[in-house]
C-alpha cells in the first residue's frame, strides 16, 4: 500500500513514517520544513534503511500538490501538516486559519477529484473539547467554541473532512484527537525539535535539565487539582504512532462507504505538572531547577482521555510507560546537545 504523509518530517509525522516503513508500507512525505528539518529525512533512512520519496511543498500551493497526486496513486493519506502553537495562533490567527484550514481544504479537494478509494487519517487534537465538564473526556463530550485559533482550525478541519466524506463514497476517514505526546525514538535519531521557547512541557523540562534554560517555570500552582498544577494525559510517541497505523489498517478492512469517525488517543491517566517533573527526576537521576510562575493564559485545568472507544473499535491500547517516554526524551535532548556542540 502507498501512503502519503503530510508533515512527515515533524515530531509525530517522522515517527509515524518510521512505523509505516517498518510495517512494509511505501510512503511519500511532503513537508514545507517550517517546523521541521530536512536532516530528519536522513535520520528516517538511518533507522529504517529506506529513504522515502520526499517533496518540499506547502499544501496551500494547490498546483504543486496536484502534481504529487498525478504521479502517484495513494491508498491512504495521513495528514499531520499544520502549525501547532496555541500562543502564536492567538497573535496571528489569519496565519493559522490559512495554513491549517486552507491546506486541509486543498488536500481534501484533490483527494476527492481523483475518484480513487482513499483512506484518510487526520491529526486532530483534544483542544477541540476545551475544558470538559466531565473527566475523563469521552467522544460524546461537546466540541466547544475554541479559545485559540489553533483549536478553531482543528475543529474546522474535522468539519471539512466529515462533510466531504458524507457525500463522497470514495473517502473513508478517521480523526485522531491526541492528548499530549511525549518521548522520542529509542535510537535518539528523531524526536521533538522545539524552536524557540518550548510550549510543550517535556522539551521545556529537558532543555532546563541540560542547561539550555536557566530554570523551568511552572505556570501556576493554584489550580483546583491534587497539587495545584495542571493535569494532562501524556502519551508515549511510540503508542501514538501505532494508533495511526492501527486506524489505517482498520479503514483498509472497512467495507462501508462514507465512513467517518473520531477517536481519543491517550492513556486515560491524568498526571500533574509536578508529578511529571518528579517522574523525570527519578527516571533520569536529575534534580531540576524550577520555580512557580503565574498562570498562562488559555491553559485549561485538566484534560485526560477516556479511551474505551478506540480500545473497543480499533483494538489499540497505550502500552508504554511515562518513565520510558521521559527517558527517551532525555536521551534525545542529550543527542541534540552533542550535535550542537559539534
Residue spans of the language-model regions?
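Short, contiguous strand/loop micro-motifs
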Residues: 2-4, 94-95, 148, 192-193, ...
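A general boundary/transition motif marking the beginning of the first structured unit of a protein
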Residues: 112, 192-197, 298, 317
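N-terminal Rossmann-like NAD(P)+-binding domain of SDR-like oxidoreductases, especially those catalyzing
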Residues: 1-184
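Generic alpha-helical secondary structure signal
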Residues: 39-42, 63, 94, 199, ...
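C-terminal substrate-binding subdomain of Rossmann-fold SDR/epimerase-dehydratase oxidoreductases
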Residues: 201-342
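Catalytic core of nucleotidyl cyclases, primarily class III adenylyl/guanylyl cyclases
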Residues: 187-189
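Short, basic/glycine-rich phosphate-binding loops at helix/coil junctions
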Residues: 183-185, 222-223
Amino acid at each position: 500500500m502507498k501512503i502519503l504523509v503530510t508533515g512527515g518530517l515533524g515530531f509525530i509525522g517522522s515517527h509515524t513514517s518510521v512505523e509505516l516503513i517498518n510495517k512494509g508500507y511505501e510512503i511519500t512525505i511532503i513537508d514545507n520544513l517550517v517546523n521541521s528539518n530536512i536532516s530528519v529525512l536522513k535520520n528516517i533512512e538511518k533507522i529504517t534503511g529506506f529513504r522515502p520519496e520526499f517533496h518540499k511543498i506547502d499544501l496551500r500551493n494547490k498546483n504543486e500538490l496536484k502534481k504529487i497526486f498525478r504521479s502517484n496513486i495513494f491508498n491512504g493519506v495521513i495528514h499531520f501538516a499544520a502549525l501547532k502553537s496555541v500562543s502564536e495562533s492567538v497573535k496571528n490567527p489569519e496565519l493559522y486559519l490559512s495554513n491549517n484550514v486552507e491546506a486541509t481544504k486543498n488536500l481534501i479537494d484533490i483527494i476527492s477529484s481523483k475518484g480513487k478509494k482513499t483512506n484518510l487519517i487526520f491529526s486532530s487534537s483534544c483542544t477541540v473539547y476545551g475544558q470538559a465538564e466531565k473527566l475523563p473526556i469521552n467522544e460524546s463530550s461537546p466540541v466547544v467554541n475554541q479559545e485559540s485559533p489553533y483549536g478553531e482550525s482543528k475543529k474546522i478541519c474535522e468539519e471539512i473532512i466529515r462533510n466531504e466524506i458524507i457525500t463522497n463514497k470514495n473517502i473513508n476517514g478517521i480523526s485522531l484527537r491526541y492528548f499530549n505526546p511525549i518521548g522520542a525514538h529509542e535510537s535518539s535519531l528523531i524526536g521533538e525539535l522545539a524552536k524557540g521557547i518550548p510550549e510543550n512541557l517535556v522539551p521545556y523540562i529537558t532543555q532546563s535539565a541540560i542547561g539550555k534554560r536557566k530554570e523551568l517555570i511552572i505556570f501556576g500552582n493554584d489550580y483546583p487539582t491534587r497539587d495545584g498544577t495542571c493535569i494532562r494525559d501524556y502519551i508515549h510517541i511510540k503508542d501514538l504512532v501505532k494508533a495511526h497505523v492501527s486506524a489505517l489498517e482498520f479503514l483498509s478492512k472497512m467495507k462501508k462507504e462514507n465512513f467517518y469517525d473520531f477517536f481519543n488517543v491517550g492513556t486515560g491517566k491524568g498526571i500533574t505538572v509536578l508529578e511529571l517533573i518528579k517522574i523525570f527526576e527519578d527516571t533520569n537521576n536529575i534534580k531540576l531547577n524550577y520555580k512557580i510562575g503565574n498562570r498562562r493564559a488559555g491553559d485549561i485545568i485538566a484534560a485526560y482521555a477516556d479511551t474505551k472507544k478506540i480500545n473497543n473499535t480499533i483494538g489499540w491500547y497505550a502500552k508504554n510507560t511515562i518513565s520510558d517516554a521521559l527517558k527517551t526524551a532525555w536521551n534525545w535532548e542529550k543527542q541534540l546537545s552533542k550535535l550542537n556542540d559539534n
